[in-house]
Amino acid sequence: MDIKRSILLVALAVVSYLLVLQWNQDYGQAALPPQNAVAQSASPALPETVPGDSSTSADVPTAGSGNQVPDSAASTAGSDLIQVRTDVLEVAIDPRGGDIVQLKLPKFPRRQDHPEIPFQLFDNGSERLYLAQSGLTGTNGPDARADGRPLYVSEQRSYQLADGQDSLVVDLKFSDGGVDYVKRFTFKRGAYDLEVRHQIANHSEQPWSGNLFAQLKRDASADPSSTTATGTATYLGAALWTSEEPYRKVSMGDMDDKNLRETVQGGWVAWLQHYFVTAWVPNKDDTNLVATRKDSQGNYIIGFTGSTLNIPAGATGETVTRLYAGPKDQNQLEALSPGLELTVDYGFLWFIAQPIFWLLELIHALLGNWGWSIIVLTVIIKLAFFPLSAASYRSMGRMRAVAPKLQALKEQHGEDRQKLSQAMMELYKKEKINPLGGCLPILVQMPVFLALYWVLLESVEMRQAPWLGWITDLSVKDPYFILPIIMGATMFFQQTLNPTPPDPMQARVMKLMPIIFTFFFLWFPAGLVLYWVVNNVLSIGQQWYITRQIEKAAQLA
């Protein structure tokens, strides 16, 4: 049993190390230098064709294509941007095209020590490009004009959601060739999603034809929301929904290799980063062409183009889509579109992680502190595994009782490993000891441990969440390494309650385990280390109690 337990503990240490490596490999995206030294154009870069009737399909803007819409010379100056402020969003809209070029989240400080500075999700400056674009392209779409994207006008340069007001409407207007266009943004209180509605009034004598497009455009700069201690980054890249795959990642590397083009009904396209997500969500009944590409300036684009909209002369029409830009709030994401909540990526153990987060959220609603919630969650998990743990500790207690007999067998058989193993198995059988009895709890609890790891890593609720004292952020490492050291000490003390392996090499390996684990856990989120510390303390108490019961029973026998 000691050999098996040693192997399992070594495997656990290796898994801990692989978690860091896998974090970097699957969720890391190396930051590349900014592609441009000046603010870049907000001109769209879209698929070359759109779904729909082939007779009405038309080219859509594609950067670098000679017969398409040319890039605008530059983005609108900051002073001319249309500013919109709600209780949860601070948005800047470029009148040229009506793109959202800046977006801040006042409820989420950029840094914990500067709560007055909001985290900025969208930016169109010299250091970083990330924006949401939408418009009308196709045969008569204003975004496909030869002289550039439309320059909208609005009644105000600044809008603010007033106290007691539940929604805020911002209209941008443009007229061309007898056709009036209104691009209407509707913001709601407490919501990170907004409606973007394009209204077309065809006053000309000719039929109008066009297509809605919406896309997310980003350069390869680093994720400003990633604050991991090891210098690695969580997943930074695109994702989309299809009927075959409700959640599919499309990394920057994938876009480097090839362009993606798929026709879907409804669905969504998104850009993911640590704790935050941006997504365009078209009408669920519309047929859309989803596409990804890398433009000539090195920017990465994911978006969709809708079916052709035909409006007869003298008639009106409209098309609607929604934009989500904010935290990975599972409740809001799930309500917005099926599968969008999966952007809170808990990995392959999501079916364990989701109930853990649900329970953790329930506890937090009662306690109001995520650190204490983790402690209570640990107690609940420990109680759930109590029967397995008790069986394991009873097995260890019996092993401790027969340790002198095992040592005698070793001295008797010397270096004859085969006879020693045979004699040990006979002893186990005689004493009714399962040599693997101590392994099962470790194996069963590993998925829970890994699932909790992803919950703490992915859940925006943990971002900048304090516990007490020096732990001001449970999502990053302990700044003074106090919890990892306590964890190592509890592991060392717990080993004193276990039977000493008869093999000297195994004994040395076991003594090294607390040191190895302490080293790995130095860089893990403080919330995860807190879970492990509490789990160890509870295990020590449980093991001590059961071991004493076994010893008393042996004395009475």
From Swiss-Prot:
InterPro entries the record matches: Membr_insert_YidC, Membr_insert_YidC_N, YidC/ALB3/OXA1/COX18, YidC/Oxa/ALB_C, YidC_ALB_C, YidC_periplasmic_sf
UniProt keyword Cell membrane present: yes
UniProt region (Disordered), positions on chain: 42-77
UniProt keyword list: Cell inner membrane, Cell membrane, Chaperone, Membrane, Protein transport, Transmembrane, Transmembrane helix, Transport
UniProt superkingdom: Bacteria
Any single biological process term in GO: protein insertion into membrane
TM region positions: 7-27, 370-390, 436-456, 514-534
Pfam families: 60KD_IMP (PF02096), YidC_periplas (PF14849)
Identification of the protein by name: Membrane protein insertase YidC
Organism from which the protein derives: Azotobacter vinelandii (strain DJ / ATCC BAA-1303)
Gene name per UniProt: yidC
